[in-house]
Amino acid sequence: QSFKNFDKCFKSNSLGSQEVFKFCLDNNIKLIYSATSASLGNNGKDKDLSPYAFTKSKNIEFLENLKKWFNFKYEVIYFYNVYGPNQICKGDMATVIGIFEDHYRQKKALPVVKPGKQTRRFTHINDTVDICYKAWKKKLCRHYSIANKKTYSILEVARMFNTKIKY
């Protein structure tokens, strides 16, 4: 989506994030930064695959420099396919599980791109909120990667709904 909405992506992830960083720095507020696991793949080389991954990874570099220059306090949390109540179920930003949930509720077959073997790691929203709170309480300036250890193929996830699947 960041290719299609480059301006929005850049304004939000670069300019918007820098404003938040500055506000936290000016007001001595510790930041909990939501990073993206999209920039971690392929030994970090995936950070250049999209404007989204690139801008998010540049923000990490900027945070590291703010720490060196101003002793800026933050915790960085990498999220993996968060799901749970009120997840996005429709539109360009819908999650895989959200799309499946929406189709399931409408009694439609779940859409899976063949062969369905693409794998993902998922994290429930409650676990995400819990680790954000725990990270905020610590004063470590660390990076946390939040995901279930088990990976699932998209087809495995679709089959968990016990309904029709459309390729």
List where the protein language model places each region.
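Short, electropositive, low-hydrophobicity segments enriched in small/polar residues
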Residues: 20, 39, 57, 88-89, ...
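Conserved alpha-helical elements of sugar-nucleotide-dependent glycosyltransferases
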Residues: 16, 96, 153
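Hydrophobic alpha-helix immediately C-terminal to the catalytic Tyr-X-X-X-Lys motif of short-chain
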Residues: 58-66, 96, 100, 157, ...
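C-terminal substrate-binding subdomain of Rossmann-fold SDR/epimerase-dehydratase oxidoreductases
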Residues: 102-167
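Short beta-loop-alpha junction of Rossmann-like oxidoreductase domains
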Residues: 43, 85-88, 155-157
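Glycine-rich "substrate-gating" loop/helix at the edge of Rossmann-like oxidoreductase active sites
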Residues: 49-52, 80-94, 114-125
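N-terminal Rossmann-like NAD(P)+-binding domain of SDR-like oxidoreductases, especially those catalyzing
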Residues: 1-82, 104, 126
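Glycine-centered flexibility sites
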Residues: 16, 41, 53, 84, ...
